[in-house]
Swiss-Prot record:
<dbReference type="InterPro" id="IPR036390">
    <property type="entry name" value="WH_DNA-bd_sf"/>
</dbReference>
<dbReference type="InterPro" id="IPR054559">
    <property type="entry name" value="PSMD12-CSN4-like_N"/>
</dbReference>
<feature type="domain" description="PCI">
    <location>
        <begin position="197"/>
        <end position="362"/>
    </location>
</feature>
<dbReference type="Pfam" id="PF22241">
    <property type="entry name" value="PSMD12-CSN4_N"/>
</dbReference>
<dbReference type="InterPro" id="IPR040134">
    <property type="entry name" value="PSMD12/CSN4"/>
</dbReference>
<comment type="similarity">
    <text>Belongs to the CSN4 family.</text>
</comment>
<protein>
    <recommendedName>
        <fullName>COP9 signalosome complex subunit 4</fullName>
    </recommendedName>
</protein>
<dbReference type="InterPro" id="IPR036388">
    <property type="entry name" value="WH-like_DNA-bd_sf"/>
</dbReference>
<keyword id="KW-0736">Signalosome</keyword>
<keyword id="KW-0963">Cytoplasm</keyword>
<dbReference type="InterPro" id="IPR000717">
    <property type="entry name" value="PCI_dom"/>
</dbReference>
<keyword id="KW-0539">Nucleus</keyword>
<dbReference type="Pfam" id="PF01399">
    <property type="entry name" value="PCI"/>
</dbReference>
<comment type="function">
    <text>Component of the COP9 signalosome complex (CSN), a complex involved in various cellular and developmental processes. The CSN complex is an essential regulator of the ubiquitin (Ubl) conjugation pathway by mediating the deneddylation of the cullin subunits of E3 ligase complexes, leading to modify the Ubl ligase activity.</text>
</comment>
<dbReference type="GO" id="GO:0005737">
    <property type="term" value="C:cytoplasm"/>
</dbReference>
<dbReference type="GO" id="GO:0008180">
    <property type="term" value="C:COP9 signalosome"/>
</dbReference>
<comment type="subunit">
    <text>Component of the CSN complex. The holocomplex is comprised of 8 subunits csn1-8. In the complex, it probably interacts directly with csn1, csn2, csn3, csn4, csn6 and csn8.</text>
</comment>
Length: 393
């Protein structure tokens, strides 16, 4: 359609007195322009529609129709027109909240397809979610916040992702959509993973491995749970988590099972095994720590140190360093930290350069023994009482 001819038609349409006739005429023009797929005439139409001389009721109605119909256009034209509309109404956003939300949501989808995660997130952030102009459901809020969090995770910005997942959490108790609740749980687990809060991430992933709808998704979540448990700091809490994962029969179907088994059985890990396991890790799980080691290096060193404590009553710094394949001074530092944090039971003699281990068994074994002892004690009491039935009331 010729631009000058279009302007004439728009002027004639705006002069119509009947509201219903005018609305239908604008919709008809919009449909013709969308079918023509020409950008220039569509921009003329949008300019006319968003002009302050056009009644607000008409502008809102036709713009809402535009948000649906323009999705049939090629993606580059959708993006160009979406940005153009937002630019035209930037000073009147309050009057067009619903239309702005629809356009920004569509732009976010387009940017996401281009893997432009940051721009996609920015579009969603700009959607007004706290409004007095319209009713916004908790489901819609949570949906937007979770999507923003997921996009920031793609950019590996866990801090920003956590901000928006926490906002989603505020309204989550009002949401009944199970798919959305699972999306929130998945995103939260990934954030814990990115923040290297591996124990929390492992527990979250394990929970997901039992409630996600598809078997492939459940197995993937279980694999993530195992990886995060392995990467966590060695100690009683991790031992309990490893035990839960090891005893889950599904774990045997996963490639990480062999590594999990050696961890659970407290066997010393070899470099070749560690290297093979490292190939499965994500970039953020291989990031360097302040001491120059990766998270996996730290986890393996601490695990091997705990394993050594089961084999030896005591060991020199030099021998421990040789066993862990690190310098003696570093071995002493790792052991000292673990002893201070009560993740390793023992004492350090710096004069003799010796570590003395106290083999008290793992926490699960201790717990079992305490339960066993309590049961034996109760049996003894019952037997003693049964010897004197006359005293029983």
């Amino acid at each position: 359609m010729d631009v000058n001819n279009l302007k004439q038609i728009l002027e004639e349409t705006s002069a119509l007195s009947d509201h219903k006739t005018k609305t239908e005429k604008y919709k008809s023009i919009l449909q013709q322009l969308v079918e023509s797929k020409q950008v220039a005439p569509l921009k003329v139409f949008i300019t006319h529609l968003t002009d302050e001389s056009t009644p607000l009721v008409i502008s809102r109605t036709i713009l809402l129709s535009f948000t649906s119909s323009h999705k049939t256009l090629p993606e580059d034209i959708q993006m160009e027109l979406g940005i153009f509309v937002l630019d035209r109404i930037q000073n009147r956003v309050v009057a067009f909240e619903e239309q702005v939300s629809e356009i920004r949501y569509n732009l976010a989808k387009l940017y996401e397809r281009q893997e432009n995660w940051r721009e996609s997130a920015r579009c969603l952030i700009a959607i007004p979610l706290d409004s007095s102009q319209r009713v916004i459901s908790p489901e819609y809020k949570v949906k937007i916040y979770v999507k923003i969090a997921r996009l920031f995770l793609e950019e590996e910005e866990s801090g920003q992702a956590e901000t928006y997942i926490n906002r989603a959490s505020d309204s989550l108790h009002l949401v009944k959509n199970q798919k959305l609740i699972l999306a929130h749980k998945t995103c939260f687990a990934r954030i814990m993973d990115y923040k290297r809060m591996f124990l929390k991430a492992s527990l979250r992933y394990y929970d997901l491995s039992q409630c996600l709808p598809k078997d492939t998704e459940r197995m993937h979540a279980l694999s993530c749970a195992i990886v995060c448990a392995i990467l966590d700091k060695a100690g009683p809490q991790r031992s309990r988590t490893l035990a839960t994962l090891y005893k889950d029969e599904r774990s045997q179907q996963l490639g990480v099972y062999t590594f999990l088994e050696k961890m659970f059985l407290e066997r010393i890990l070899k470099k070749t095994e560690v290297k093979k396991f490292a190939e499965q890790l994500k970039p953020h799980q291989m990031a360097l720590l302040s001491d120059g080691n990766t998270v996996l290096d730290r986890a393996v060193i601490e695990h091997n140190l705990l394993s050594a404590s089961k084999l030896y009553n005591n060991i020199t710094f030099d021998e421990l360093g040789s066993l862990l394949e690190i310098q003696a001074e570093k071995a002493e530092k790792v052991a000292s930290k673990m002893v201070c944090e009560e993740r390793l039971i023992g004492s350090i003699d710096q004069i003799e350069r010796l570590i003395q281990f106290e083999n008290v068994g793992d926490s699960l074994t201790q717990w079992d023994k305490k339960i066993e002892g309590l049961c034996i004690h109760m049996n003894n009491i019952i037997e003693s009482i049964s010897k004197y039935p006359e005293f029983i009331v």
